[in-house]
Structures are given as C-alpha cells and as structure tokens.
Amino acid sequence: MRHRKSGRQLNRNSSHRQAMFRNMACSIVRHEIIKTTVAKAKELRRVVEPLITLAKVDSVANRRLAFARTRDAEVVGKLFTELGPRFQERPGGYTRILKCGLRAGDKAPMAYIELVGRPEAAEAVDVEAAE
C-alpha cells in the first residue's frame, strides 16, 4: 500500500528521478522557463520553490545547502544574486505552470513552468529535447 507516500515515481528509480529533477531545477533557474510534461512540472515545483526560499537569505551556509542540492556554482550564483532579491517580498508561489497542449510523439500533456515575474525576453527551453 502506498498510503501517505508523497511525490510521483514517474517510472524511474530514485537516483534517476533525483538527477532528473536536479537538472531540471538548474535549467529553470538558468532559463526561467522550460517546457516539460505536466506531471514533471508539478513535481518540479517541490524542488525549485524551497531553493528560491533558501536564496532569500544570503549566507555561506545557505549557499552551501543550495550547492549541495544543485551541484552547479553558476546556478547558485544566480539564485542568490538575482532570484533571492527578486522574490524577497513574495511569501511563496514563485513558479507558474501553463498547459500547452499535447506532445506530438505520444500525446503526453505538456506544460511550460516559469518563474513568476520573469523578464519577457526569456525564451522557453525544451527540456524533453535535452534529455
């Protein structure tokens, strides 16, 4: 029985799932909008939102925690210099999911996940093509 087990399995083992969400979190911090499946987007919120909350208080300890979760120094830098100050007054809800139809190959429901208040010039990055 899977009572009280939160999160989606997404037909992956735990290490694959962890690596996938780490890569997707780095992509959304870097590009501020990505295109992925609806299920992955909903699950990605659970990874990205705590990272941004962590970045609102710039300290060495928080930077080390963020690096441990992302393993990317460039992403940690952007989190603490741009995103943390941008969302300083917002108490949560840093991401938005916009459904965008079905994928051509398998009719999987697709969605854009973006950071709220991102600059309009940012172009969407297709994460599925990168995998």
Swiss-Prot record:
According to the UniProt entry, its GO molecular function terms are:
structural constituent of ribosome
By sequence similarity, the record places it as follows: Belongs to the bacterial ribosomal protein bL17 family.
What GO biological process terms does the UniProt entry carry, in alphabetical order?
A: translation
Q: Which UniProt keywords apply?
A: Ribonucleoprotein, Ribosomal protein
Q: Which Gene3D superfamilies match?
A: Ribosomal protein L17
Task: Specify the protein name.
Answer: Large ribosomal subunit protein bL17
- Name the domain of life this protein comes from: Bacteria
Gene Ontology CC: cytosolic large ribosomal subunit
Q: How does it assemble?
A: Part of the 50S ribosomal subunit. Contacts protein L32.
Pfam families to which the protein is assigned, alphabetical: Ribosomal_L17
Q: Which gene encodes it?
A: rplQ
Q: To which species is this protein native? A: Shewanella denitrificans (strain OS217 / ATCC BAA-1090 / DSM 15013)
